[in-house]
Protein backbone atom coordinates (compact mmCIF):
# COMPACT_ATOMS: atom_id res chain seq x y z
CA UNK A 1 0.00 0.00 0.00
CA UNK A 2 1.46 3.37 -0.97
CA UNK A 3 1.92 6.18 1.54
CA UNK A 4 -0.85 8.16 -0.19
CA UNK A 5 -3.30 5.26 0.15
CA UNK A 6 -2.32 4.78 3.80
CA UNK A 7 -3.05 8.46 4.45
CA UNK A 8 -6.37 8.23 2.61
CA UNK A 9 -7.39 5.17 4.65
CA UNK A 10 -6.42 7.01 7.84
CA UNK A 11 -8.57 10.01 6.84
CA UNK A 12 -11.51 7.70 6.11
CA UNK A 13 -11.21 6.22 9.61
CA UNK A 14 -11.17 9.76 10.99
CA UNK A 15 -14.34 10.67 9.08
CA UNK A 16 -16.09 7.55 10.39
CA UNK A 17 -14.95 8.25 13.96
CA UNK A 18 -16.16 11.86 13.65
CA UNK A 19 -19.56 10.66 12.38
CA UNK A 20 -19.91 8.18 15.26
CA UNK A 21 -18.93 10.84 17.79
CA UNK A 22 -21.30 13.41 16.26
CA UNK A 23 -24.26 11.01 16.51
CA UNK A 24 -23.68 9.02 19.70
CA UNK A 25 -21.59 11.36 21.89
CA UNK A 26 -22.21 14.96 20.81
CA UNK A 27 -25.70 14.28 19.40
CA UNK A 28 -24.97 16.85 16.71
CA UNK A 29 -27.04 16.14 13.62
CA UNK A 30 -25.53 18.89 11.48
CA UNK A 31 -21.97 17.74 12.22
CA UNK A 32 -22.96 14.17 11.29
CA UNK A 33 -24.75 15.15 8.07
CA UNK A 34 -21.79 17.35 7.04
CA UNK A 35 -19.72 14.14 6.81
CA UNK A 36 -22.08 12.54 4.27
CA UNK A 37 -21.68 12.54 0.50
CA UNK A 38 -24.60 13.51 -1.72
CA UNK A 39 -26.27 11.13 -2.33
CA UNK A 40 -25.80 8.92 0.73
CA UNK A 41 -27.50 5.87 2.20
CA UNK A 42 -27.65 5.01 5.90
CA UNK A 43 -29.32 1.69 6.67
CA UNK A 44 -29.68 -0.47 9.78
CA UNK A 45 -30.36 -3.67 7.87
CA UNK A 46 -32.16 -5.90 10.41
CA UNK A 47 -34.46 -3.07 11.52
CA UNK A 48 -34.96 -1.65 8.02
CA UNK A 49 -34.40 1.85 9.39
CA UNK A 50 -32.33 4.73 8.05
CA UNK A 51 -32.52 7.01 5.05
CA UNK A 52 -31.63 7.36 1.39
CA UNK A 53 -30.79 11.08 1.25
CA UNK A 54 -29.34 13.79 3.48
CA UNK A 55 -32.87 15.02 4.27
CA UNK A 56 -34.10 11.52 5.18
CA UNK A 57 -31.00 10.83 7.27
CA UNK A 58 -31.35 14.19 9.05
CA UNK A 59 -35.01 13.38 9.87
CA UNK A 60 -34.10 9.84 10.93
CA UNK A 61 -31.37 11.05 13.28
CA UNK A 62 -33.53 13.88 14.70
CA UNK A 63 -36.71 11.85 15.23
CA UNK A 64 -35.73 8.20 15.60
CA UNK A 65 -32.16 8.07 16.91
CA UNK A 66 -31.09 11.02 19.06
CA UNK A 67 -34.22 11.30 21.25
CA UNK A 68 -34.14 7.53 21.75
CA UNK A 69 -30.55 6.76 22.70
CA UNK A 70 -30.25 4.69 25.89
CA UNK A 71 -28.80 6.60 28.82
CA UNK A 72 -25.98 4.07 29.27
CA UNK A 73 -25.18 3.38 25.60
CA UNK A 74 -21.62 2.16 25.05
CA UNK A 75 -19.89 1.51 21.75
CA UNK A 76 -16.54 -0.27 21.76
CA UNK A 77 -14.62 -0.98 18.59
CA UNK A 78 -13.49 -4.60 18.30
CA UNK A 79 -11.84 -4.57 14.87
CA UNK A 80 -11.57 -2.30 11.87
CA UNK A 81 -10.19 -2.94 8.41
CA UNK A 82 -10.13 -0.66 5.41
CA UNK A 83 -9.09 -0.17 1.84
CA UNK A 84 -9.25 2.99 -0.24
CA UNK A 85 -13.04 2.80 -0.76
CA UNK A 86 -14.54 1.36 2.42
CA UNK A 87 -14.13 0.69 6.11
CA UNK A 88 -15.53 -2.40 7.82
CA UNK A 89 -15.81 -2.01 11.57
CA UNK A 90 -16.97 -4.50 14.18
CA UNK A 91 -18.29 -2.93 17.40
CA UNK A 92 -19.74 -4.18 20.65
CA UNK A 93 -22.83 -2.12 21.48
CA UNK A 94 -24.12 -2.27 25.05
CA UNK A 95 -27.17 -0.64 26.61
CA UNK A 96 -30.07 -1.00 28.99
CA UNK A 97 -33.31 -1.17 27.02
CA UNK A 98 -34.78 1.66 29.10
CA UNK A 99 -36.94 3.19 26.34
CA UNK A 100 -38.32 2.31 22.91
CA UNK A 101 -35.55 2.20 20.31
CA UNK A 102 -37.27 2.79 16.94
CA UNK A 103 -33.90 2.91 15.16
CA UNK A 104 -32.80 -0.48 16.52
CA UNK A 105 -35.95 -2.39 17.52
CA UNK A 106 -38.98 -0.74 15.88
CA UNK A 107 -42.25 -1.48 17.67
CA UNK A 108 -40.63 -3.02 20.77
CA UNK A 109 -41.50 -1.52 24.16
CA UNK A 110 -38.74 -1.02 26.74
CA UNK A 111 -37.84 -4.25 28.57
CA UNK A 112 -35.44 -2.62 31.08
CA UNK A 113 -32.97 -5.45 30.42
CA UNK A 114 -29.26 -4.98 29.78
CA UNK A 115 -27.98 -6.27 26.45
CA UNK A 116 -24.87 -6.32 24.32
CA UNK A 117 -24.80 -7.05 20.62
CA UNK A 118 -21.97 -7.30 18.13
CA UNK A 119 -22.58 -5.02 15.15
CA UNK A 120 -20.76 -4.89 11.83
CA UNK A 121 -20.81 -1.72 9.75
CA UNK A 122 -19.71 -1.51 6.13
CA UNK A 123 -19.04 2.13 5.32
CA UNK A 124 -18.25 3.26 1.78
CA UNK A 125 -16.67 6.59 0.89
CA UNK A 126 -16.65 8.99 -2.02
CA UNK A 127 -13.44 10.98 -2.51
CA UNK A 128 -13.07 14.31 -4.29
CA UNK A 129 -9.80 16.03 -5.07
CA UNK A 130 -9.59 19.76 -5.66
CA UNK A 131 -6.39 21.79 -5.86
CA UNK A 132 -4.38 18.85 -4.54
CA UNK A 133 -6.58 18.27 -1.48
CA UNK A 134 -8.69 15.11 -1.20
CA UNK A 135 -11.84 15.13 0.90
CA UNK A 136 -13.67 11.94 1.84
CA UNK A 137 -17.36 11.70 2.67
CA UNK A 138 -19.52 8.73 3.65
CA UNK A 139 -21.61 7.53 0.70
CA UNK A 140 -23.07 4.40 2.30
CA UNK A 141 -23.27 3.27 5.93
CA UNK A 142 -24.86 -0.15 6.45
CA UNK A 143 -24.98 -1.83 9.84
CA UNK A 144 -25.91 -5.43 10.60
CA UNK A 145 -26.26 -7.28 13.91
CA UNK A 146 -27.64 -10.52 15.32
CA UNK A 147 -31.23 -9.32 15.62
CA UNK A 148 -32.58 -12.67 16.82
CA UNK A 149 -29.91 -12.96 19.51
CA UNK A 150 -30.54 -9.39 20.66
CA UNK A 151 -34.29 -9.97 20.85
CA UNK A 152 -33.72 -13.20 22.79
CA UNK A 153 -31.51 -11.40 25.33
CA UNK A 154 -34.21 -8.75 25.71
CA UNK A 155 -36.98 -11.36 25.98
CA UNK A 156 -38.98 -10.32 22.90
CA UNK A 157 -40.21 -12.16 19.82
CA UNK A 158 -39.74 -10.92 16.25
CA UNK A 159 -43.24 -9.39 16.41
CA UNK A 160 -42.25 -7.41 19.52
CA UNK A 161 -44.27 -9.46 22.01
CA UNK A 162 -42.70 -10.93 25.16
CA UNK A 163 -41.20 -14.42 25.12
Predicted feature locations:
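C-terminal and inter-domain tail/linker signature
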Residues: 1-163
Amino acid sequence: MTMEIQQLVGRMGGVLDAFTTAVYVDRDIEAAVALLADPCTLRNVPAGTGGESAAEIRRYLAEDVLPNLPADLTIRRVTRTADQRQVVVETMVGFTHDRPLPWLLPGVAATHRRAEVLAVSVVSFRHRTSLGTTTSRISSHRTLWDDTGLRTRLGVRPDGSSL
